[in-house]
């Protein structure tokens, strides 16, 4: 069985109505623009009041309409966040535009192929 590194769940509209139905669980998420280009990869960690729901409520309130998101519930959210960032960097040669503004320290390299 091959290990799946990429987050391949379907995109959902980043709207308050959709986000308010999310679980209050730990995990990671991706934000994409209307064209499907990933602009941010985030995490909902243990210090987040209501996990993925509160993180994406914040994202929805700060971003223009037309953005979309997908999530993965994951108790190892920090490790998974690093994996997703490294896969994106390997696939595209750089971090997503909004992650590049404040990159994580000491991000390793990953060869997902």
Residue ranges and their predicted role:
Residues 61-65, 80, 95:
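Charge-biased low-complexity segments
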Residues 62-75:
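Catalytic cores of nucleic-acid endonucleases
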Residues 1-50, 54, 72-84, 105-113:
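GIY-YIG nuclease catalytic motif and its immediate N-terminal context
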Residues 54-61:
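Short, compositionally biased low-complexity segments
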Residues 82-94:
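Short, compact, well-ordered microdomains
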Residues 92-102:
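Coupling/hinge elements of helicase-like and P-loop NTPase modules
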